[in-house]
Design a protein with these regions (language model features):
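Rhodanese-like catalytic fold shared by cysteine-dependent sulfurtransferases
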Residues: 1-21, 25-144, 148-281, 285-395, ...
Length: 532
């Protein structure tokens, strides 16, 4: 692939079947405002942490995108140093793409939202409006309401009386709540997608119960003037032996009807041995507690509902081999079925799950592994540190995420997004001989940033040892708020419900009208960062 990729060449690459990755290096708010459909949001500052897991094969063709190509050119040497051998830059960036009247889309996780709307229309998912559900709750209707989002989202605010049951757990656990065939099951989320996918997962079970999705979820509930329940703790009950047997039977039926492929533990281990030359994702779709207790070595935690809700957060190479794993194969098979309907060509589930993996001699890891940061050790060897305490007249620069900076930073610290450090540092420290101290929460991102400043010619750069956490631990004072932003805080995007009524209304209009290419006649409100 050419080092400079024209818009036409990128369009041809993305419409083909050869494995490739297209990485948008801008920050999340800029990506939300407009991006090329099916590209992966990977802010430049996260390359060292996330890229090895997103693109495992170093020979994969990779195209870097930003607004005008300048950020991509800054990032290209990093990828080369990491061993990626086929890296191109979109000539002229998104500006050139748009100049040729090529389309862009708004929003985050757009492929998943498109799929949710497709599910609604193709399978005609039954729906209930928020006012109607409120009336049914007030009238004491016999029904079970489940929230298919993450436990954290559920706890922040759910439909009154709802149980937490993330989408990937519905088929396994719904029988623990529903005791009669005439009980209505209501599935809700924050908006639309996860309600529809969750309801359709239950409908595939063949239950006699009425299964209905709540139209517009918790946002619709609030827009209707209704109050959410805050701090609920009705967690999904553990699955019984009967529930497991039912889920296994449903999975067996879906495997046959959908023509799904199972792979053995030995086959997965062979794939893992080739992951440096053939892209591979192994996703464990169970709960966080189950994953932490023990999972196949190398598997990434991707709970089933979120793996469908946020596809582009988990993978960057659509042609890669994807393997789903769980404890007995049932939840993994259901995730595989959804990805097949999404059009992924190389998908499979681990037959027999974790027990089969361990029986075959596969290594098991526990906890949630902290991703290695490429280049961090080398950067540490080349930069000096300073202990918490008096920093003298040094210029203090924070490269934390902006929301972390707002919560606590060293007094006087200027905030710069690390993705744009080279182009912003001159406004904060124009004298390259001046002492500079770089900070972040724990010292990792600041170490990488300090190494960059050294390459730029800053001769007296140090890193705050242990980061702001160590600073606070030493009893030093901190500042809060946007005291000295030296860059646009576009790295954090608030949810529509965090932005207010107008943002929620705009979001729901936008999502409902999405076409199969991620386009909508309705616009989202401009993305907002944590500073607003």
């Amino acid at each position: 692939m050419s080092a400079i990729v024209t818009p036409a060449a990128l369009g041809a690459l993305m419409s083909g079947t050869a494995p490739h990755a297209v990485l948008d290096l801008r920050e999340r708010a800029a990506y939300e405002r407009g991006h090329i459909y099916w590209t992966t949001s990977l802010p430049r500052r996260l390359l060292e942490t996330r890229l090895p897991g997103l693109v495992t094969a170093r020979s994969t063709p990779i195209v870097l995108i930003d607004e005008d190509g300048s950020l991509s050119e800054l990032a290209r040497p990093t990828l080369a140093a990491m061993g990626y051998t086929d890296v191109g830059v979109l000539a002229g960036g998104l500006g050139a793409w748009r100049a040729e009247n090529r389309s862009t889309v708004q929003g985050l996780n757009v492929p998943s939202k498109v799929f949710g709307e497709r599910a609604l229309h193709e399978w005609k998912t039954p729906q209930v409006s928020c006012p109607d559900l409120a009336k049914r709750i007030a009238g004491g209707d016999d029904m079970v309401i489940v929230d298919s989002r993450t436990p954290e989202e559920y706890h922040r605010g759910c439909i009154p009386g709802a149980w937490s049951m993330p989408g990937g757990e519905l088929v396994l656990r719904i029988g623990e709540l529903v005791k009669r065939p005439d009980q209505t099951i209501i599935v809700h989320c924050g908006g639309r997608t996860r309600s529809y996918i969750g309801a359709e997962s239950l409908r595939r079970m063949g239950l006699p119960n009425p299964i209905i999705a709540l139209e517009n979820g918790t946002m619709g509930w609030q827009l209707a003037g209704l109050e959410l329940e805050r701090g609920a703790e009705r967690w999904a009950p553990p699955p019984s032996s009967r529930g497991r047997a039912v889920a296994a039977e449903v999975a067996k039926r879906i495997v046959k009807s959908d023509g799904l492929r199972g792979v053995t533990a030995a086959q997965v281990r062979d794939m893992q041995g080739r992951r440096a030359v053939e892209n591979l994702y192994v996703f464990d779709v169970r709960t966080t507690e189950e994953y932490a207790a023990g999972h196949p070595a190398g598997a990434v935690w991707a709970p089933g509902g979120q793996a469908v809700q946020a596809i582009d957060d988990y993978l960057a190479v659509r042609g890669a081999q994807i393997v789903f794993a769980c404890d007995d194969g049932s939840r993994a098979a259901l995730s595989t079925a959804w990805y097949k309907r999404l059009g992924f060509p190389n998908i499979a589930y681990l037959e027999g799950g974790l027990p089969a993996w361990t029986a075959a001699g596969g290594d098991v890891e526990s906890g949630h592994p902290v991703p290695a940061v490429w280049g961090l050790d080398a950067a540490r060897a080349g930069v000096a540190t300073v202990a918490p305490g008096a920093l003298g007249d040094a210029v203090v620069v924070s490269v934390d995420p902006s929301d972390v900076y707002l919560r606590a930073h060293v007094p006087g610290a200027a905030w710069i997004c690390r993705s744009r450090l080279e182009t912003r540092i001159g406004g904060v420290a124009p004298d390259r001989a001046r002492a500079v101290v770089v900070t972040c929460a724990d010292g990792a991102q600041s170490t990488l940033a300090a190494a960059t400043l050294g390459r730029l010619g800053y001769s007296s750069v140090r890193v705050l040892a242990g980061g702001v956490r160590a600073w606070q631990g030493a009893g030093q004072p901190v500042e809060t708020g946007a005291t000295r932003l030296a860059d646009e805080a576009d790295d954090i995007v608030l949810k529509p419900y965090e932005r207010g009524r107008a943002a929620m209304e705009a979001y729901l209009r936008w999502e409902e009208a999405l076409d199969m290419e991620g386009r909508s006649p309705h616009a989202l409100l401009p993305g907002t960062s944590a500073t607003r």
